[in-house]
């Protein structure tokens, strides 16, 4: 089992990155927020989980233990697979997911593309007892790590727009959301801008 990777980022796609470790390139599927923190040619470390299916093996990458643990917990819900679990973490932080479940907040969970009322209710019913302690454990660590400083606005626009279209939003939806978010606060870094744009789109 591959539990972590440390190596050079050699390519970044819409939903994946390739990290080269000792001459071997590993394709890692991860969230737009995590991808936005990676830079081609630079070293990166990701915690990983391998998901094995009959027709494929996939590596999923995470910035911290809380994200990886939440990814695993979400998949214990009936009918919720790795793709939707990752979508949840693309829109909400582990703490936000846990708080929404613990508080019975189906509306917040439905901000995730692919999570309808039925799935949101199922998340709450099946995980409410399991996240009670988790919400306490991630108060300090569940927030994103320190944002990258000094990112040029044009880079932020490109990265966030690409991340949103990768999540299934149309180019126009992505452009409009990014423009609105950065007009309100031009100083946002990529991670903050992405979360603000997702919140805006999720409220529609």
From Swiss-Prot:
UniProt keywords, alphabetically: Cytoplasm, DNA damage, DNA recombination, DNA repair, DNA-binding
Region feature Flexible linker, mapped onto this chain: 143-151
Pfam family, one: HHH_5
GO annotations of cellular component type: cytoplasm; Holliday junction helicase complex; Holliday junction resolvase complex
InterPro entries: DNA_helicase_Holl-junc_RuvA_I, NA-bd_OB-fold, RuvA, RuvA_2-like, RuvA_C, RuvA_C_sf
Region of interest (Domain III), ranges: 152-204
Disulfide pattern: none
GO molecular function: ATP binding; four-way junction DNA binding; four-way junction helicase activity
GO process annotations (BP): DNA recombination; DNA repair
Localization per record: Cytoplasm
Record region (Domain II): 64-142
Spans annotated as Domain I: 1-63
Functional note: The RuvA-RuvB-RuvC complex processes Holliday junction (HJ) DNA during genetic recombination and DNA repair, while the RuvA-RuvB complex plays an important role in the rescue of blocked DNA replication forks via replication fork reversal (RFR). RuvA specifically binds to HJ cruciform DNA, conferring on it an open structure. The RuvB hexamer acts as an ATP-dependent pump, pulling dsDNA into and through the RuvAB complex. HJ branch migration allows RuvC to scan DNA until it finds its consensus sequence, where it cleaves and resolves the cruciform DNA.
Family assignment from sequence similarity: Belongs to the RuvA family.
Subunit structure as annotated in this protein's UniProt entry: Homotetramer. Forms an RuvA(8)-RuvB(12)-Holliday junction (HJ) complex. HJ DNA is sandwiched between 2 RuvA tetramers; dsDNA enters through RuvA and exits via RuvB. An RuvB hexamer assembles on each DNA strand where it exits the tetramer. Each RuvB hexamer is contacted by two RuvA subunits (via domain III) on 2 adjacent RuvB subunits; this complex drives branch migration. In the full resolvosome a probable DNA-RuvA(4)-RuvB(12)-RuvC(2) complex forms which resolves the HJ.
NCBIfam families: ruvA (TIGR00084)
Matches recorded under HAMAP family: DNA_HJ_migration_RuvA (MF_00031)
Domain text: Has three domains with a flexible linker between the domains II and III and assumes an 'L' shape. Domain III is highly mobile and contacts RuvB.
Protein name, UniProt field: Holliday junction branch migration complex subunit RuvA
The organism of origin for this protein: Corynebacterium efficiens (strain DSM 44549 / YS-314 / AJ 12310 / JCM 11189 / NBRC 100395)
Lineage, broadest ranks: Bacteria, Bacillati, Actinomycetota, Actinomycetes, Mycobacteriales
Protein encoded by which gene: ruvA
